[in-house]
Amino acid sequence: MNKRNFIATGASLAAVALLAAGCTTTGGASGDPAAQRQAIDAAADSALSRLYAQAAGSRELVASSRGMLVFPNFVSAGFVVGGASGQGVMRKGGKSTTYHRMTEGSVGFLAGAQSQAVFILFMTDDALKRFEASTGWTAGVDGSVTLLTVGADARVTTLTGQQPVIGFVLTNSGLMASA
């Protein structure tokens, strides 16, 4: 295979992977916005139950947050060029208030697909207000996010809650390799 065909094939595979990632974010909900919100809420409830079961202390941390974004099905896919997307909900005091979409792009050595649940907790009123006032919030630019990995016997401590914005990621399924 010559270099030109290899690059064209790689680009085609990357485009298909990105298209597949975009097509799987709706979770089977119909085109009806109310049905989509209901599906996102149900998936968020399920993801929160998993978080509470896997990370001791997470329920208390969520309860003390000023607001929380839950992206129950954040799907990543790629082959050299990758992308990720998911729909989520902002919750305040346990109630769904607004609905959001999160996207991500990456370039590098990667191949595969993976689904994750992403939780972003706003621990201060100021951090939440900055998010709500933005028209395209970017982690690291509009706010720094302390990312916590949740694995076996994960425990959330009181030190965790001292950061203004905290993120949790739970793997749902799939395998993603990167370098």
Where are these regions (language model features)?
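Small-residue-enriched, tightly packed secondary-structure blocks
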Residues: 24-179
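C-terminal motif of bacterial Sec signal peptides marking the signal peptidase cleavage site
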Residues: 20-22
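Alpha-helical transmembrane segments
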Residues: 10-13, 61
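Poly-acidic low-complexity segments
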Residues: 1-2, 66
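Bacterial N-terminal signal peptides that target proteins for export
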Residues: 2-11
